[in-house]
């Protein structure tokens, strides 16, 4: 359920990373403090799940990806982000179990986002949209994620954004609890705040 949106967000966030792809090494790492979380609703209260781990593979031939991105200049590059379904944490054991079941975690252990292209949006801030596909619960569909780029400490790149995800589009049935008396809403908002730096690609935790 919520997992689905999360993965999207995880996707969205990673796409952003593409703009921050590293220099000649062609790799980029996520700094500690990077966050990815999902907000949803139910018939009784709002809820939130966080992503404890993101595995990103970023490649670019450009040696000044961060600088060019902050100037609104496009660079060539590819991005693939994998998110282990098992790392989703909703701070509620029952919710975690229902999420895993809704996302078919046993059969499809990973949520994957692959970026195919992106574009900048003219304006006072450097923003844009990442276009790619999201593979979730065994189904792959196109997705577009709006993002904003900013400077981070020590020459890094900060990428923020959020995107609503309709779980049923990926054939994810919103969970129900307490014999159907508690129902989770079908739309989840994926939020991300990523701190990126040039260097060896690693898993952000």
Q: What are the language-model segments listed below?
A:
Residues 1-10:
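Bacterial N-terminal signal peptides that target proteins for export
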